[in-house]
């Protein structure tokens, strides 16, 4: 049966359409049933009126439960008050499947329960919106590179070497030989760039990090371009252009989804401004509060954040008490109960987030004030830095000891590596890591020894410096961290359909 898509309803205003989908939510009043339908392309309210449908079809509409599947026909009416901006006034309805006891109800559910039912949680309005935004980012990423002459290539997932050390590798057996799941396709990307000029890979990456932070997954998707005849500055220019382009695509195509997840768009719109670029040494001074940014000290900003969080905790606790008292009142209508339950759930989630911030902020303040130059940034250090800027921050020229063996050393001052990390604002931290690649064969060999990596496993990589070596650069972007920032999500687990992370491999 050919039907229309909810996402196309704007084309059908004033006309009759046929739709198929599922009941996301329902409510009823005297002789009226309001069904929020989803079909994957969008959401809309369908109105079943007894006087129009007749008793038999009206009773069928009234019997529909959450996640039941149904077919309907009706007239499209523009209504900006409704979800998606349209309403369908039904002239026909037919049940396709009657769902019973759908486990994810409007009441509050804990994170573990929702993750155990991830296969069903994906149907929720919020998760639908996040996945739609993820899709836009993926398509925009491919479009950006394809439009600029890059060739999409594929790096192997099984490898016999470690790109950035062995401590976080998943080991496996490859026909009797030890092998690892890839941490990065970058080394292979360099080889492909020497053949094609400009390439990018887009594939799964695996890190065996026993970390349960809001930023870590064990399986995630990486975008890794590599460019021949490209230095650090050109690489940084491309990164800035790239992030501006893909975020702008979401702002253009996903306004409804951003509204559904209540993501303020003003911070995202600031990607049109030039990104902040600061060397590592200056970033350290900012983190320690020794250098002001627009008259502000990082430590003072964190102290203000802590005071604001504590006020928010008190206000949210008061709201929770008031909501609980209202729910305890007799005689509430079903719609009122649902509204208060939804608001109570949202308030408790805000409280959990605020209480976590209250625990973290004093530690971040102590860590920032005592940060030692020469160390890599931790997640809290990145958060501190991003609190002072409204655009992404590009930190470049890092101590070579904290960067990967393949990062190019500065010929004029070998203490520094020509690397760059891009930190997303609003406390999200690193989303891009990249830099210029080492072309000095002797320095590269020394680095492989220094990192205690098996030289024989990298002979093929060293061949890239023996035959036609040229300046080249690249970067890696973790898709899920990008999605988390764009959607302003508190945890990276919501950025991928079925997250794999420490302690969870199902469903």
Residue ranges of model-derived segments:
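Class II aminoacyl-tRNA synthetase catalytic cores and aaRS-like
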Residues: 1-507
């Amino acid at each position: 049966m050919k039907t229309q898509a909810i996402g196309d309803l704007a084309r059908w205003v004033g006309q009759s359409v046929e739709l198929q989908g599922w009941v996301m939510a329902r409510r009823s009043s005297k002789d009226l049933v309001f069904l929020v339908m989803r079909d994957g392309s969008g959401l809309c309210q369908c109105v079943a009126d007894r006087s129009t449908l007749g008793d038999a079809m009206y009773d069928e509409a009234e019997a529909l439960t959450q996640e039941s599947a149904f077919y309907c026909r009706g007239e499209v009416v523009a209504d900006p008050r409704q979800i998606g901006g349209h309403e369908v006034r039904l002239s026909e309805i037919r049940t396709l499947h009657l769902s019973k006891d759908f486990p994810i109800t409007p009441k509050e559910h804990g994170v573990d329960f929702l993750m155990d039912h991830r296969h069903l949680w994906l149907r929720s309005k919020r998760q639908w919106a996040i996945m739609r935004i993820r899709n836009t980012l993926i398509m925009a990423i491919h479009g950006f590179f394809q439009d600029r002459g890059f060739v999409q290539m594929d790096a192997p997932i099984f490898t016999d070497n470690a790109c950035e050390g062995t401590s976080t590798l998943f080991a496996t057996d490859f026909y009797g030989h030890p092998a690892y799941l890839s941490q990065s396709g970058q080394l292979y990307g360099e080889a492909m760039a020497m053949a094609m000029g400009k390439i990018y890979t887009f594939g799964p990456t695996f890190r065996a990090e026993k970390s349960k932070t809001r930023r870590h997954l064990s399986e995630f998707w990486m975008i890794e371009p590599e460019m021949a005849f490209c230095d650090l500055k050109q690489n940084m220019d491309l990164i800035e252009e790239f992030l501006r382009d893909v975020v702008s695509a979401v702002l253009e195509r996903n306004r409804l989804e951003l509204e559904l997840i209540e993501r303020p768009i003003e911070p995202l719109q600031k990607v049109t401004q030039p990104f902040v670029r600061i060397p590592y040494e200056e970033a350290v001074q900012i983190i320690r509060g020794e250098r002001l940014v627009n008259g502000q000290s990082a430590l003072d900003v964190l102290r203000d954040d802590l005071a604001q969080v504590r006020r928010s905790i008190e206000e949210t606790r008061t709201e929770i008490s008031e909501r609980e008292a209202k729910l305890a009142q007799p005689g509430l209508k079903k719609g009122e109960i649902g509204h208060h339950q939804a608001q109570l759930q949202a308030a408790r989630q805000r409280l959990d987030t605020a209480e976590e911030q209250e625990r973290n902020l004093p530690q971040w303040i102590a860590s920032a004030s005592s940060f030692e130059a020469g160390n890599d940034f931790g997640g809290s250090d990145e958060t501190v830095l991003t609190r002072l800027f409204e655009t992404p921050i590009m930190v470049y020229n890092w101590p070579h000891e904290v960067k990967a063996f393949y990062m190019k050393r500065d010929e004029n001052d070998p203490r520094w590596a020509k690397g760059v990390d891009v930190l997303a604002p609003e406390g999200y931290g690193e989303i891009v890591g990249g830099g210029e690649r080492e072309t000095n064969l002797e320095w590269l060999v020394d680095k492989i020894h220094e990192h205690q990596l098996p030289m024989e496993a990298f002979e093929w990589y060293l061949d890239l410096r023996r035959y036609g070596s040229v300046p080249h650069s690249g970067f890696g972007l973790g898709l899920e961290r990008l999605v988390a920032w764009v959607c302003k999500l508190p945890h990276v687990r919501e950025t991928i359909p079925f997250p794999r992370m420490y302690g969870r491999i199902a469903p």
